[in-house]
Each structure stands twice: as C-alpha cells, then as structure tokens.
C-alpha cells in the first residue's frame, strides 16, 4: 500500500510523498488520480524526455529502485508527482511536476524540502535542459539553484527513451557538488540502470 511521508512543522502544511505500489494501481482511491497524473506527465515533459506510460506503470509494479510518489497537500489534495530512483549511495529525480493551476504557490519548494528529509544525507541528482534551450529552461535552473542545487555536469547526453530517437543534451544538477569521479559514476549508473537499451 501507499506509504506516506510528510515534512515540516505543524504550522506549515507541506507536501507529503505518497509512494504508489503495485496494489495502488488497482486501488480505487489512487487509481482515480492516474488519468490526471498521466496527462500532467505527458504535457510537462516532451516525448524525448519521458518513457511510455505503460513502462512507468510496470516500474511502479516492480517495487525496485524506482519510486513513484503522489504529491499530496493537506488542503489541496494531490498536487503533482515526483519519480525517484534510489541507488546505493544517491537518489536520482527522474520526473517532477506540479499541476499547472497550482504552480507558483511554493509547492515545488515544499516538495524539494520533503524529498530532502525523505532521502536524508544522500545526494540528489536531476537532469535539466540547458538554459540556452529556452527561457523556461533558464528559469528552471535558477529555481533549483535557489533551492540549493547546482549544475555539476554540462556535457551529459541523456540516452533516448524511444528506439527511433537520439540522445538529448542535458545538464546534471545536484544537492552536493561531489567529486568528479563520483559524478561520472552517477551518470554511468543512469545510463546503465534508468534508460532502456535498444
């Protein structure tokens, strides 16, 4: 069943992480959110930066390193989702999105705080589009920097999610600067464990 983790003081309602499991895919309560979350997933990320939804559901069912979390707010209900991979000594945030009508209400910041409490002292890594790609990409990098992340690798090529596509040039951002060898190992782990091999 879904497990719940909330961060923050009692006076500040923060976003909770509710992990989806194989059972939740068939549970009416959580199943009712799936169409909205699927639409958010497919609208928030370009085709080249997301796996097919059926593959995502399969990963949820496997209960391995992949964690799909509903983001729940005590007053607003489900506000988005985040997907995390947990490896031996770091976490990787694959996808993170807030529902469009709830953006700019500090829910993303609250979610990052909750994630940091959930993962403890292990570093967290994200892929982001280069700021040269668009104004939105630049704002996203600034947003993560304001929340304690920094670009640690600029010459990273995200492997393709789909057989017919090429890799996507992205940056790697992290909650810790880290040694170069460690960052290279993180990138190799992503290539080996996260992305499909065609």
Predicted segments with their positions:
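C-terminal "cap" of GNAT-fold acetyltransferases
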Residues: 136-137, 157-198
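Conserved beta-strand in the GNAT
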Residues: 70, 76-85, 90-97
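Short amphipathic alpha-helix that is part of the acyltransferase structural core
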Residues: 12-55, 72, 170, 184-198
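Short amphipathic, helix-prone segments within low-complexity/disordered or flexible regions
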Residues: 2-7, 15
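Conserved GNAT acetyl-CoA-binding A-motif
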Residues: 119-135
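A short helix-loop-beta-strand connector motif used in the catalytic cores of GNAT acetyltransferases and
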Residues: 60-70, 166
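Conserved acetyl-CoA-binding loop-helix of GNAT-fold acetyltransferases
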Residues: 98, 104-118
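Conserved active-site alpha-helix within GNAT-family acetyltransferase domains
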Residues: 130-154
């Amino acid at each position: 069943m879904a497990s719940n983790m909330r961060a923050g003081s009692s006076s500040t309602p923060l976003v909770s992480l509710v992990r989806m499991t194989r059972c939740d895919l068939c549970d009416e309560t959580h199943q009712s959110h799936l169409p909205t979350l699927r639409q958010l997933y497919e609208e928030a990320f370009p085709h080249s930066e997301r796996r097919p939804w059926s593959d995502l559901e399969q990963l949820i069912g496997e209960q391995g390193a992949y964690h799909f979390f509903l983001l729940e707010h005590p007053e607003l209900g489900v506000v988005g989702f985040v997907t995390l991979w947990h490896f031996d000594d770091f976490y990787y945030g694959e996808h993170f999105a807030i529902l469009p009508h709830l953006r700019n209400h500090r829910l993303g910041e609250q979610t990052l705080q909750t994630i940091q409490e959930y993962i403890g002292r292990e570093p967290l890594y994200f892929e982001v589009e280069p700021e040269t790609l668009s104004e939105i990409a630049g704002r996203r990098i600034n947003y993560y920097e304001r929340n304690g992340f920094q670009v640690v690798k600029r010459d990273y090529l995200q492997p393709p999610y789909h057989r017919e596509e090429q890799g996507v040039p992205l940056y790697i951002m992290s909650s810790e600067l880290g040694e170069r060898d460690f960052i290279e190992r993180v990138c190799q782990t992503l290539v080996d464990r996260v992305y499909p091999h065609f």
